[in-house]
């Protein structure tokens, strides 16, 4: 991957939120445990916004490019607008502790595509503690699903507690796993200090309407 000079630093620790310059794309991180539905959500956002905005996607996997390959296979964006970072270690390291590879990949996307409006940065699957460096993304979505039971929001963790949007995914499976969606919504509200939570099923709502509304609100606020 090409290397570039940056006017931002490559910290090994989180720093205050980056300041977006005029014309820079909004960067939204999408994180969450393995199998929670991150890639499917990214695909849904791309399908809904690709005709009205200039988009790109950056995925993170440990040893493969599987998530990027999935997005290309399903043609959610042109291939050149989807790229991957192979982290080679703990997934959270590349999105939080040493974000150099992700910053380089973002620079490559910006250089290849004029006037990008939005870059979605998907993390590799990790646990409830994984969050993005504020030097990498402007806002972040954290995706959990009902398969782990309705106790997951109650367990908290930085992703659940501090993400800008929490998504409780695969709600259509709740009856099959005995998860109480009202309990999940209540517990999420209790730990999130007013930050929004969305309960959704991409099976029932393939457009991810509530998440899409939130993404559009972030784009509008970014100007």
From Swiss-Prot:
Region (Disordered): 1-31
GO CC annotations on file: cytoplasm
Tree of life domain: Bacteria
Location relative to the cell: Cytoplasm
GO molecular function, one term: nickel cation binding
Gene3D superfamilies the record matches: P-loop containing nucleotide triphosphate hydrolases
Keywords: Chaperone, Cytoplasm, GTP-binding, Nickel insertion, Nucleotide-binding
InterPro entries in UniProt: CobW/HypB/UreG_nucleotide-bd, P-loop_NTPase, UreG
Positions that bind GTP: 32-39
GO biological process, one term: urea catabolic process
The keyword Chaperone belongs to this UniProt entry's keyword annotation: yes
Similarity comment: Belongs to the SIMIBI class G3E GTPase family. UreG subfamily.
Subunit structure, interactors included: Homodimer. UreD, UreF and UreG form a complex that acts as a GTP-hydrolysis-dependent molecular chaperone, activating the urease apoprotein by helping to assemble the nickel containing metallocenter of UreC. The UreE protein probably delivers the nickel.
UniProt function note: Facilitates the functional incorporation of the urease nickel metallocenter. This process requires GTP hydrolysis, probably effectuated by UreG.
Name of protein: Urease accessory protein UreG
Native organism: Mycobacterium marinum (strain ATCC BAA-535 / M)
């Amino acid at each position: 991957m090409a290397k570039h000079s940056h006017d931002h630093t490559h910290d090994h620790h989180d720093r205050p939120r980056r300041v977006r310059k005029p014309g820079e794309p909004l960067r939204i991180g999408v994180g969450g445990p393995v199998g929670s539905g991150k890639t499917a959500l990214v695909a849904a956002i791309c399908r809904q916004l690709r005709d009205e905005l200039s988009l790109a996607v950056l995925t993170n996997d440990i040893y493969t490019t599987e998530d990027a390959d999935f997005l290309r296979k399903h043609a959610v964006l042109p291939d050149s607008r989807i790229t991957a970072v192979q982290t080679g270690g703990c997934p959270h390291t590349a999105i939080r502790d040493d974000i150099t590879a992700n910053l380089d990949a973002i620079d490559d996307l910006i250089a290849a595509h004029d006037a990008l409006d939005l870059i979605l940065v998907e993390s590799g699957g990790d646990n409830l503690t994984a969050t993005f460096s504020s030097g990498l993304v402007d806002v972040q979505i954290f995706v959990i699903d009902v398969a782990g039971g309705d106790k997951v929001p109650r367990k908290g963790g930085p992703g659940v507690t501090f993400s800008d949007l929490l998504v409780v995914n695969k709600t259509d499976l709740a009856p099959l796993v005995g998860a109480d969606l009202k309990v999940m919504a209540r517990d999420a509200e209790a730990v999130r200090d007013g930050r929004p939570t969305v309960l959704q099923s991409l099976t029932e709502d393939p457009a991810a309407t509530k998440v899409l509304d939130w993404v559009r609100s972030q784009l509008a606020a970014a100007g």
